[in-house]
Amino acid sequence: MKKPQLRLGARGIVIREDGKIAIFNKSNKNEYKLPGGGLEGEEEPEKAFKREVLEETGCEVEIIECLGTTEEYKSLNNFKQISYVFVGKVLKDTKQLNVTEKEKDEGAKLLWETPEKALEIITKCYNELVASKYESVYAIKFVVLRDRKILEKWMEFNR
């Protein structure tokens, strides 16, 4: 068996002072997820998390906790992703998202919700997933399930 393509990522929970957390919606892709993305080159996971959060939420954050890692293996694509998972507290909100053209085309927008509402939205997304012109249900389910599990575990240990 061929060795899977490996991608390293950094993602997690971003909390405002009012207790609401960020969820990133790609409406044309039928996806709700926590902020985060791939590491660039030799980038450290903490720097990648802060960069991705700034791009996807417009917020500068302080990392207050490292929750660990997640590992996904997509056998149909022979693809493995390891994500470093953090909790970040908003220090400053620039109110300016810096998303890619692809993310704009996918309908990228930011929502701030209570953790309970965020979990409800992500769970509903997972349960009602449909394919889009961007991704198959197979690919999106990994993202949404991963982030649902991160949020569930964080809520379980922080409530």
Question: Residue locations for each model-derived region?
Answer:
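A short gly/proline-enriched turn/hairpin at secondary-structure junctions
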Residues: 33-36
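Local beta-strand/beta-hairpin segments that build beta-sheet-rich folds
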Residues: 67-68
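Short loop/turn segments immediately following the C-termini of beta-strands
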Residues: 26
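Conserved hydrophobic "DFG−1" position in protein kinase catalytic cores
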Residues: 14-15, 23, 88, 112
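Nudix hydrolase/Nudix homology domain
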Residues: 30-31, 103-159
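Unchanged
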Residues: 39-62, 73-127
